[in-house]
Design a protein with these regions (language model features):
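Short S/T/G/P-rich N-terminal loop/turn motif that feeds into the first structured element of a domain
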Residues: 1-70, 74-237
Length: 237
């Protein structure tokens, strides 16, 4: 069966060979809450759909309109099998409960690297999603860019205390990078952006290198709050 969990996902788990991120637009804070509840109810009344799905997580956007979805699959083949057999009935029930949901896009990624203090056990109060797009000609430099970001983070002389972790993913489309960053609170992230420098880092050569990387096309930053976690219930048949 399916059960809810308050635990945040482990972005480092090695068996999650195909992490996906998608975004829905629902329009208002009330519809955000209604959609989260509809998702939970729809999934909980059904058996867990596949051993290939490790967990499914939903977050409410601080823009008061969007929902972020993160699903951890063992493989893309497991997801495609789910689409053929189990997805549509769930979509139909959710859309009946909350009509007018706009499903913006689904992006497929592979986890590349993470950075986190080993002794930091804080539960994040805010998830910051940083999406970076590269020119197609610069696709092969995405790993080097992530390495440069982590080098800048780890060499930061005065890191903001509100940052907990960063989890960098490479899009299978060849042009995208996504950083799933855990922060103590939204205010901590806002304060970090307001500090001297461009972004969360100080005005140093390492950050300038990251921000002026050849082929870097655009970037967006969005803040979310964890709303729902769904995992298989191994205690029930």
């Amino acid at each position: 069966m399916t059960r809810r969990t308050d635990a945040h996902p482990d972005l480092n788990r090695t068996d999650a060979g195909a992490p996906f991120f998608s975004t829905w637009s629902v329009g208002t804070p009330l519809r955000q809450r209604q959609t989260v509840e509809a998702i939970g109810a729809t999934w909980e009344r059904r058996p867990w759909p596949s051993d290939g799905l490790l967990g499914y997580y939903v977050y409410t956007g601080h823009d008061a309109s969007t929902l972020l979805h993160h699903s951890q699959w063992r493989s893309e083949q497991a997801y495609e099998a789910f689409v053929k057999t189990h997805r549509q009935e769930r979509v139909d029930e959710i859309d009946t409960a909350v009509p007018g949901i706009e499903r913006l896009r689904l992006d497929r990624y592979r986890h590349y690297r993470s950075v986190r203090r080993p002794d930091d056990t804080r539960v994040p109060g805010c998830i910051v999603i940083v999406e970076i797009e590269f020119e197609e000609s610069a696709a092969d430099s995405r790993r080097a860019w992530v390495d440069a970001v982590i080098e800048a983070l780890e060499s930061e002389p005065d890191p903001h205390p509100g940052g907990i972790s960063g989890h960098f993913h490479l899009g299978t489309d060849g042009t995208r990078v996504l950083n799933y960053a855990e922060w103590e609170s939204a205010q901590a992230h806002i304060d970090a952006l307001a500090a001297p420098g461009d972004g969360i880092g100080s005005a140093r050569q390492e950050w300038e290198r990251v921000q002026t990387w050849p082929g870097l096309k655009s970037s967006t930053v969005s803040r979310y709050e964890y709303a729902l976690g769904l995992i298989p219930d191994r205690t029930r048949p």
